[in-house]
Amino acid sequence: MNNSTIDNPQIGKDVIESLTLGMYEVCRFIYREYIQNAADAVDKAIDLSLLKKGEEAIHITIDTDHRKIIISDNATGIEQGNVMRVLRNIAHSTKKRGEDKGFRGIGRLGGLGYCSKLTFETSYYGEPSKSIMTWDSELLKYIINDRNNSEEAVQVLAQVTKLDTKKEDTKVGNKNENFDY
């Protein structure tokens, strides 16, 4: 064993399984997580005067033809410069316990156990482009089950996530959380 292994703590890839694929035994709990995230975003938009009380909206769409479930809101979105920090990192939430509905920064990943790809699409109010963070659940399962390699948790996160940007077609922030099952 080299000194860097002894001196520096390591977190193996199996912890990712506990926080994603193994978080919920019953899939319906993931919907609560995404709706709570949307509700927190709507509350923030009202607090920032981006929306007036009564203008907020959370929509749930089940698209059986394309095998997708979409949960969207008309709230603040995430600033493009913060998307990687907010949507790829785990347990780095800025939400406040007792004030926000969610606060740990892990619930959004529970959907990975029930889909092939988990997509977070967001645009911050007034920004001209939207960010699309995709988590590859199939690749995540493959990496975790591969006992011949012992990747660190952060290496796995880098491998299974992808960030794209596209021109936004509206000035109102949108946040969609999609499951391709």
Where in the sequence are the language-model features?
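GHKL (Bergerat-fold) ATPase N-terminal catalytic module, capturing the glycine-rich phosphate-binding loop
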Residues: M1-F179
